[in-house]
Amino acid sequence: MSILILLESPGKISKISSILGKNYVVKASMGHFRDLDPKKMSIDFDNDFEPVYIVTKPDVVKNLKSAMKNIDLVYLAADEDREGEAIAQSLYDVLKPSNYKRLRFNAITKDAIMSAIKNAGDIDKNLVDAQKARRVLDRLFGYLISPILQRQIGGKLSAGRVQSVTVRIIIDKENEIKNFINKNADSSYFKVSGTFNGAKATLHESNDKKPFDLETAYKGKTAQIALINSENPNSKVVNFMKRCLKSQFFIHSVEDKMTTRSPAPPFTTSTLQQEANRKFGMSIDSTMKTAQKLYEGGYITYMRTDSVEISAEGHRDIKKIITDQYGADYYQKNLYKNKAANSQEAHEAIRPTHPELLTLEGEIEDAYQIKLYKLIWQRTIASQMKPAKIKVTIIQISISKYVEDKLNPFYYFQSQIETVVFPGFMKVYVESIDDPDTDNQITKNFTGKIPTVGSKVTMEEIIARQEYMRPPPRYSEASLVKKLEELGIGRPSTYVNTIKTIINREYVKITDVPGIKKDITIYSIKSENKKHIMEVYEDTDTILLGKENKKIVPTNLGITVNDFLMKYFPEFLDYKFTANMETDLDYVSTGTKNWVDIVQDFYDKLKPIVDELSKQKGLSQSSERLLGEDNDGNEITATKTKFGPVVRKKIGDKYVYAKIKDPLTLDTIKLSDAIKLLEYPKNLGQYKGFDVLLQKGDYGFYLSYNKENFSLGEIDDPEDINLDTAIKAIEAKKANNIAEFNLTENGKKIKAIVLNGKYGYYVQVTRNRIKKNYPIPKDLDPNNLTEQQILSIISVKKTYKKSAPKGGSKTIRKPSQTKYSQTKSTKSTKSTKSTNKKFVGKSAKKTTKKTTKK
């Protein structure tokens, strides 16, 4: 009997062929090979919204039909989710096999494949309908709304049923951050920490605001010593530090309590994406591609799932590994409950297919596959282990001055020491956390002796650091997936494409957020060689409040599109509406609801709005506002474009534009603000017949000259930039230019420049306004390169991007300390810091700043 197995992806062919042997022919459909015609709506409205498909990969279909000749049985073995079921249906519709069965497996192992063959069935029409409904809903939303966007805003704009809501989520977060900063821009306080006998401690303030009562004084929360609105705003914290100078520190109480920490469930798609991002910095796309390879290699189960269940076979294998590797005392069968409504579609969590394979080192060479497999193995094994037992010791430390004088507010230090009594699952794996700062004040693996109540402890240091209220963090790819999952928007198979799409459409971007510079003050007392030094040191520092790396932020275009959609289609961008639609699709997948009814209801709500808007003109009402005129009589206005809010100045027949940036808005900007924004580009004069323009970018000042940009190096003060300094910068860069080539690459004309840089010779090429640098091999002479050699150099995939931003690099200044001391012979003496503020102390040193991020 001749049998043909049709897979979804070619990466599985080799593994499955090796399992089944020569009697089976194994081919792949290369994913979806038919789709809706992109040039048409491709929906039959007279036939219950039935999609009208076209074959998009005719060569694939031709090859599969050829493979079917002389075949007795065809197994449709696409993946076991909605998309896979739709591909299986497409294979049946297009190839029309006379004898077929639907083959489903979630792991590429011999046992899984043979079991799937034994239990082969039919195509699940409910899953097919659920995928069909999603595809039709997405097409209706995109093809009905996108033309309105293009007509009203301009450009090749498009809307997406899930993508547009995802953009809204990101914009809502950005607005939340802006509102927080506007409300709390200057809200700061001092947070005090200390180290006593080697253990970390945090200052606490008593909740008791009544007259001092020793019985209730030590019931409090982490202290935040506020600044005072006066000539000496830090006096409150300074007075606290002075009292610490005069104090001794005693153990008020020691309390032990036992707690347990339970393991996390095995991975779903979204939790794997989040953890790989936190631990390895992997993008969700990279994570899924790596997991796909592991699945195709037979190392893990299917990677698109929102189930946390493990099969009976999996439990059996995991139990053996735990008892063999760690002992029977560590094993505990844990059953986890699925949260997702449609998790019945994916039968198992992501786990190793052969947990006895502890590592892939020596099996494969790909470092990412090795790392990701280890992570999946650890999480899976840990999920079936006993909870960790941890002894938490809470130590309260009294400050003698506050006890003796019965001061209010009453302060004391509290230390938390965690000792692992039984590691349990933590012997294998500990889940990462999004905010490591929450763990910073806990002393772990403490080896010192726990002091007794009433004993005196050695103060090693006390640090009072000014802190600003931190805005909520922006979304990373992983945390956005988590948010989508929490809201019930999208499914495991859609997360990657959703985020990819809104980035490609330039509605959002992944970027580094520079943060807002804030000057802070730090006071410290340090004890050296266990001697109590009666001195308070003052440092100044500069933090970058809200600085974040690789976060998703909306673009001006995304904000403009979102504003339009929120104005005219608010129901369709509502979180609950979109989540309810996902739930309805889940009901379709189980046969509880009919897909046509869901699409009809959606269409009946959307079509009247589209029809009404299509009749109207000028929906995007002009937001232009006349601000006034500059000194030369040029009219200046503030307006909104598809790229965001701008100010513009009319000079003759042309307009000069400048972006309106935070904290300014279209409504709050004034004429004086606009004049400053429009100050650049500034014409410094001409050099060799071309204008030299001073430009101001996101990273500082730079020059534009003869269609090229030039860095100004360390110069960041516009007052220091004139035509002479500009010419020097231009000539300095040109001195490094060895040769220029006008080439043709893939039918397109490009310009290549041979340069001598800081790290050696390289070729710089600009494609689509993006510069890329290619190192020149050492065996080539950079002064005598041919066009063919240049083309060969720039065809190498490995590149490095030019890292220096326009305007040059920023200088980070180093800190020093100002010392204030409390002498033993007198109660107070005078001291000053470099800013001429006076504090108690005996000496002062020059204070400078450093920049850190927060």
From Swiss-Prot:
<dbReference type="InterPro" id="IPR005733">
    <property type="entry name" value="TopoI_bac-type"/>
</dbReference>
<protein>
    <recommendedName>
        <fullName>DNA topoisomerase 1 type prokaryotic</fullName>
        <ecNumber>5.6.2.1</ecNumber>
    </recommendedName>
</protein>
<feature type="binding site">
    <location>
        <position position="79"/>
    </location>
    <ligand>
        <name>Mg(2+)</name>
    </ligand>
</feature>
<feature type="active site" description="O-(5'-phospho-DNA)-tyrosine intermediate">
    <location>
        <position position="302"/>
    </location>
</feature>
<keyword id="KW-0238">DNA-binding</keyword>
<dbReference type="GO" id="GO:0003917">
    <property type="term" value="F:DNA topoisomerase type I (single strand cut, ATP-independent) activity"/>
</dbReference>
<feature type="site" description="Interaction with DNA">
    <location>
        <position position="134"/>
    </location>
</feature>
<feature type="site" description="Interaction with DNA">
    <location>
        <position position="138"/>
    </location>
</feature>
<dbReference type="InterPro" id="IPR023406">
    <property type="entry name" value="Topo_IA_AS"/>
</dbReference>
<feature type="domain" description="Topo IA-type catalytic">
    <location>
        <begin position="124"/>
        <end position="610"/>
    </location>
</feature>
<dbReference type="InterPro" id="IPR013825">
    <property type="entry name" value="Topo_IA_cen_sub2"/>
</dbReference>
<feature type="site" description="Interaction with DNA">
    <location>
        <position position="135"/>
    </location>
</feature>
<feature type="site" description="Interaction with DNA">
    <location>
        <position position="505"/>
    </location>
</feature>
<dbReference type="InterPro" id="IPR013497">
    <property type="entry name" value="Topo_IA_cen"/>
</dbReference>
<dbReference type="Pfam" id="PF01131">
    <property type="entry name" value="Topoisom_bac"/>
</dbReference>
<dbReference type="InterPro" id="IPR013826">
    <property type="entry name" value="Topo_IA_cen_sub3"/>
</dbReference>
<dbReference type="GO" id="GO:0044423">
    <property type="term" value="C:virion component"/>
</dbReference>
<dbReference type="GO" id="GO:0046872">
    <property type="term" value="F:metal ion binding"/>
</dbReference>
<feature type="domain" description="Toprim">
    <location>
        <begin position="2"/>
        <end position="110"/>
    </location>
</feature>
<feature type="site" description="Interaction with DNA">
    <location>
        <position position="143"/>
    </location>
</feature>
<feature type="compositionally biased region" description="Low complexity">
    <location>
        <begin position="814"/>
        <end position="834"/>
    </location>
</feature>
<feature type="site" description="Interaction with DNA">
    <location>
        <position position="32"/>
    </location>
</feature>
<feature type="region of interest" description="Disordered">
    <location>
        <begin position="802"/>
        <end position="854"/>
    </location>
</feature>
<dbReference type="Pfam" id="PF01751">
    <property type="entry name" value="Toprim"/>
</dbReference>
<keyword id="KW-0479">Metal-binding</keyword>
<dbReference type="GO" id="GO:0006265">
    <property type="term" value="P:DNA topological change"/>
</dbReference>
<dbReference type="InterPro" id="IPR013824">
    <property type="entry name" value="Topo_IA_cen_sub1"/>
</dbReference>
<feature type="region of interest" description="Interaction with DNA">
    <location>
        <begin position="158"/>
        <end position="163"/>
    </location>
</feature>
<feature type="compositionally biased region" description="Basic residues">
    <location>
        <begin position="835"/>
        <end position="854"/>
    </location>
</feature>
<comment type="function">
    <text>Releases the supercoiling and torsional tension of DNA, which is introduced during the DNA replication and transcription, by transiently cleaving and rejoining one strand of the DNA duplex. Introduces a single-strand break via transesterification at a target site in duplex DNA. The scissile phosphodiester is attacked by the catalytic tyrosine of the enzyme, resulting in the formation of a DNA-(5'-phosphotyrosyl)-enzyme intermediate and the expulsion of a 3'-OH DNA strand. The free DNA strand then undergoes passage around the unbroken strand, thus removing DNA supercoils.</text>
</comment>
<dbReference type="GO" id="GO:0003677">
    <property type="term" value="F:DNA binding"/>
</dbReference>
<keyword id="KW-0799">Topoisomerase</keyword>
<keyword id="KW-0413">Isomerase</keyword>
<dbReference type="Pfam" id="PF13368">
    <property type="entry name" value="Toprim_C_rpt"/>
</dbReference>
<dbReference type="InterPro" id="IPR023405">
    <property type="entry name" value="Topo_IA_core_domain"/>
</dbReference>
<feature type="site" description="Interaction with DNA">
    <location>
        <position position="304"/>
    </location>
</feature>
<dbReference type="InterPro" id="IPR003602">
    <property type="entry name" value="Topo_IA_DNA-bd_dom"/>
</dbReference>
<dbReference type="InterPro" id="IPR025589">
    <property type="entry name" value="Toprim_C_rpt"/>
</dbReference>
<dbReference type="InterPro" id="IPR028612">
    <property type="entry name" value="Topoisom_1_IA"/>
</dbReference>
<dbReference type="InterPro" id="IPR003601">
    <property type="entry name" value="Topo_IA_2"/>
</dbReference>
<feature type="binding site">
    <location>
        <position position="8"/>
    </location>
    <ligand>
        <name>Mg(2+)</name>
    </ligand>
</feature>
<comment type="similarity">
    <text>Belongs to the type IA topoisomerase family.</text>
</comment>
